[in-house]
Curated annotation (Swiss-Prot):
It is found in: Cell membrane. It is a multi-pass membrane protein. Belongs to the UPF0391 family. This is UPF0391 membrane protein Sbal195_1447. One of its GO terms (cellular component) is plasma membrane. Disulfide bonds: none annotated. The chain crosses the membrane at residues 6-26, 28-48.
Length: 58
C-alpha cells in the first residue's frame, strides 16, 4: 500500500510541474496517445485471457 502511495505522489508532482510550467498542452497530447496505447493493451490482454480460459484476477 505504501508503494502505491509513493507512485501516486510522484505522478502528482510530475503533473503539477507540467501544469504550472505552461507545457500542459504538449503533455496532454502525449497523455492522449499513451491513454489509447494502454486501452489497446488492455483489450489485447483481455482477449488473450479469454482465449486461454482464465478468469481475471482481482
Amino acid at each position: 500500500m505504501l508503494g502505491w502511495t509513493l507512485v501516486f505522489l510522484v505522478v502528482a508532482v510530475i503533473a503539477g510541474l507540467l501544469g504550472f510550467t505552461g507545457i500542459a498542452g504538449a503533455a496532454a497530447g502525449i497523455a492522449k496517445i499513451i491513454f489509447f496505447v494502454f486501452i489497446v493493451l488492455l483489450v489485447i490482454s483481455l482477449l488473450v485471457n479469454a482465449f486461454r480460459g482464465k478468469s481475471p484476477r482481482l
